[in-house]
C-alpha cells in the first residue's frame, strides 16, 4: 500500500475553440479503476477523489499515452497514501493545468488560467543540474533524519540497561552511538545548508527569467489587450504573482520533498518496528484524503479570487498615483482613498476567508495527529507490557511518528502557500502564452527609396474589440496622395483618431483594407512600418522620465548626437534645450512633468522626425497649447510636413485651412471633402462647423485684464 500512487494524465497545450481535456487516474500497479470499483476503503477514497476532481475540470479527447506534455508524475515510492492524506494538493499540482477560468472577452487567444507545464519546463530546464544536486542534498538530509529515531531508540535501550552503579559501562557502550548521532546531526546541517543555497540560486534565476519573459510577452500584445486590462493588474503579474510562484517552488523542494521523504522513510521504519501499530496509523488515511480533497477544491477557488482582488486594488492605486495631478486638481484625494479602501476591504475579506479555510485544515490535521500519538502510546504500552515490543522500539516508534507528524505539519503549512503559488503561476503562464493577433514583426519591407507615401483606406469597417457591437468606421474610403496634407475634421466620436490608429496598424479593420503604396498593411512588417515609415505626434505627448537626449533618441535608438541635434533644430526645440543648465542631459521628470506643454510637444516632434518618416500623423498636435506655443509648434510642424504625406486630425478648423484636402467625417463615414474654399462654397457640414466655431470664439475667449492705472496727480486749485 505504501507504493500505491496516482498518475494524472493531462493533455497539454491550448486548443482554441475546444474545452480542456479530462483526467485519467491509474495506479502504479496493474490495477485500473473503473467507476464501480470499491474493493477497499482506500480504493473508495481514490474513486471519490477522482469524482471530485472530475466535477471541477472540463473535458475533451484524451492525449496520446506517452506524450511528454501529457503525463505528469506526482510522487513515487516515497509518496504513499499517508503523504497524500495530509497533502492531497501535491497531486493537484498536476491538475492546475486543467484549472478553468473565465477568458477575457477582448483577447480571443486567452484560454483561461491554467498551469502551463511546457512553459514551466522551459524555465526549469537550464537549471536542472543545480536543481538535481539540491534535490539529492534534500533527500540526503531527509534520509539522515530518518535514521535518527532508530539510533535514539538504541540509546534508550542502553539507558534502560544500566543503573546508577554502572555509569562507567554506560559511558563506554554509549560513546560510539552518541558519536554516530553527532555525526548525523552535523551531516544533516551541512546537507540542509547546501540544498537551501542551491534552491535560492535556482529560484531567483527562474524568477528573473520569468519576469523578463512575461514583460516581453506583455509588450508584444495588441493594443486591444491593453484596452481591456488595467496597467496595475499587469504590473501585479510581474511582481506579486512571480514572487508567489517562486516562493512556492522553493518551498515544495525545501519542505515538501524533504517532508514527504521523511514521511515515507519513517513509515517504512515504523512498519519494521511494529506492523500492527503502523496499520493502525494508516486507518485514518482514506478519511483524511477525502476531507483534504474537498477542502482543497474550495481553498483553490478562494485563492484565485483573492489574487484577482489584489490585482484590482493595485489597479486602483496605480491609476490614482499615475494621475495624481488630475486627482489633486479636482481635490478627489478622499474619493480615491475610499475607492482604494473599498478594494482593500474586499481583499481583506477574501484573505480572511482563505485564512480560515487553511486554519481549519491545519487544526483538523493537528487533532488527528494528536489522537494518533495518544493511540500509539496506549496501544504501544500494551504491547510493551505483553513483551511484544521493547521500550527502545516504542521510543523509536514515538520519535519516528513525531517526525511524521512534524513533516505533516510542514506540509499543512505548505499547503496554503502551494495553492496560492500554483494559482499565481497559472496566471503568469497564461499571459506568457498569449499570442497577439498583430505580431511585432513579420512581413515584407519596402526600400526607403521606393516609398512614395500613398495611403488608401478602401471600404474600411471597424469596431473596437472591447466594443464589438459598436461600429466606429462604416464603409470608410479615403486616399492620402503622396506628399500632400489631408486633414480630418468633424465632431468628436466621428472616428478620426481611429483612422490614425488603423494607419499605424494598432488594429486591423474588421472589413476592407488599408494600403501603403498599393500594398496591404497586413503584408508589411509592423515594426518596420511604425519604426521607419510612420511618425506620430499626439495631442498630449508622453515622455519618459529620462534625459531629453534619450527621449528624442527613442525614435531612432542608433541615432548619433548630431542627428538628435538636427531633429531638435527642425522641431524648434534646440534653443530652449540649450537654455537649460544641463542641456540635452536634462531629466524631464515622469511623463515630462517638468516641461511646459509647448516644450513637450516640440520634443515629441523631434522624436518623430529623427527617423525621417514618410508618413506623418498629427493628432490634435496644437489644440492644447497657448497662442505663442502654438505658433512656435506650428512652424515646426510646417517644416516637418514639407515633402511628406501628412494626416492631420483637428478640431480647431483654423489650423487646417492650408491643407491640400479637408475631409469631413460624420458617423464613421466621409461626409464631404474638398479644399477650404470649396467646402465653404458648398455650404454643408464643414461650413456649419466653421460658423459654430466663429460663434463660440467670442464666448470662449477670455478677455485680457486691463492694465491697472497708477495714482493720478490731482492739481488743486488755489
UniProtKB/Swiss-Prot annotation:
Which GO molecular function terms does the record list?
A: ABC-type oligopeptide transporter activity; ATP binding; ATP hydrolysis activity
Q: What is its main location?
A: mitochondrion
Function field: ATP-binding subunit of the mitochondrial ATP-gated potassium channel (mitoK(ATP)). Together with pore-forming subunit CCDC51/MITOK of the mitoK(ATP) channel, mediates ATP-dependent potassium currents across the mitochondrial inner membrane. An increase in ATP intracellular levels closes the channel, inhibiting K(+) transport, whereas a decrease in ATP levels enhances K(+) uptake in the mitochondrial matrix. Plays a role in mitochondrial iron transport.
Cellular localization per UniProt = Mitochondrion inner membrane
| Annotated InterPro entries | AAA+_ATPase, ABC1_TM_dom, ABC1_TM_sf, ABC_transporter-like_ATP-bd, ABC_transporter-like_CS, P-loop_NTPase, Type_1_exporter
- Membrane spanning stretches: 128-148, 179-199, 279-299
- What residues does the transit peptide encompass? 1-25
Species in which this protein is naturally found? Pongo abelii (Sumatran orangutan)
Entry binding sites for ATP: 490-497
Question: What sequence ranges are listed for the domain ABC transmembrane type-1?
Answer: 133-420
Pfam families membership: ABC_membrane (PF00664), ABC_tran (PF00005)
Name-wise, this protein is: Mitochondrial potassium channel ATP-binding subunit
**What interactions and quaternary structure are annotated?**
The mitochondrial potassium channel (mitoK(ATP)) is composed of 4 subunits of CCDC51/MITOK and 4 subunits of ABCB8/MITOSUR. Physically interacts with PAAT. Interacts with Neuropilin-1 (NRP1) in mitochondria.
Domain of life assignment? Eukaryota
Q: How does it sit in the membrane?
A: Multi-pass membrane protein
Q: What is the activity regulation entry?
A: Channel activity inhibited by ATP via ABCB8/MITOSUR subunit.
Homology family: Belongs to the ABC transporter superfamily. ABCB family. Multidrug resistance exporter (TC 3.A.1.201) subfamily.
